[in-house]
A protein has these predicted regions:
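Tryptophan-anchored aromatic micro-motifs
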Residues: 40-63
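Beta-strand secondary-structure signal
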Residues: 45-47, 65, 77-79, 117, ...
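Generic short beta-strand segments
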Residues: 47-54, 83, 105-108, 126-134
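Short, surface-exposed coil-to-beta transition loops
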Residues: 60-65, 86-91, 110-115, 138-144
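Contiguous, well-ordered beta-strand patches that form the walls/edges
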Residues: 73-123
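Edge beta-strand at a domain terminus
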Residues: 124-154
Length: 154
């Protein structure tokens, strides 16, 4: 009696393994450097001028930095970090499609953010955000104008 054992090695499946890429291949187990990442030029740190109208119709002006980075495994998705100069306490997610910045309705750290649209122009972004505060539900209207100061490469 002769036993022959034949094992099959799994063939490497080459493709894009970066889930943020337009051409992500979930079945690929070996990256072939073919990944196509969009909106890379929009990622980075922005110096922001923030004019905010509070519930009493008073306007406040603030200057601070906002970081725009990729949202996990969503080729159009982004996260805006430090909106309102609140660090990681207020992170707003959205999408970039062409020059458009699309922010869906969402909750972030108790803040209710209403759906809105903004846009990018060269190295700047512009967006108006309406939100309600966590405890009292006070309405605020925020106009953000950001100019890129640092690129993020990813």
């Amino acid at each position: 009696m002769i036993l022959i054992w034949v094992g099959c090695a799994e063939e490497p499946l080459r493709g894009c393994t970066n889930c943020n890429a337009v051409n992500f291949n979930e079945y690929a187990n070996e990256d072939d450097d073919s990944c196509i990442l969009i909106n890379t030029a929009r990622l980075g740190e922005y110096a922001v001028m923030d004019s905010t109208m509070d519930w009493s119709m008073t306007w406040w002006i603030y200057d601070y930095n906002v970081t725009i980075e990729r949202d996990s495994c969503n080729y159009e998705g982004i996260k805006m970090i430090n909106v309102g100069n609140k660090g990681n306490d207020l992170i707003i997610t959205g999408k970039i499609i062409g020059d458009s910045l699309i922010i869906p309705s969402q909750f972030s750290s108790g803040y209710e953010i209403f759906e809105t649209n903004g846009y990018f122009l060269n190295d700047s972004f512009f967006v108006q955000i309406m939100y309600l505060t966590p405890i009292f539900g006070d309405a605020y209207l925020k106009n953000l104008k950001g100019k890129k100061i640092i690129n993020i490469l990813n």
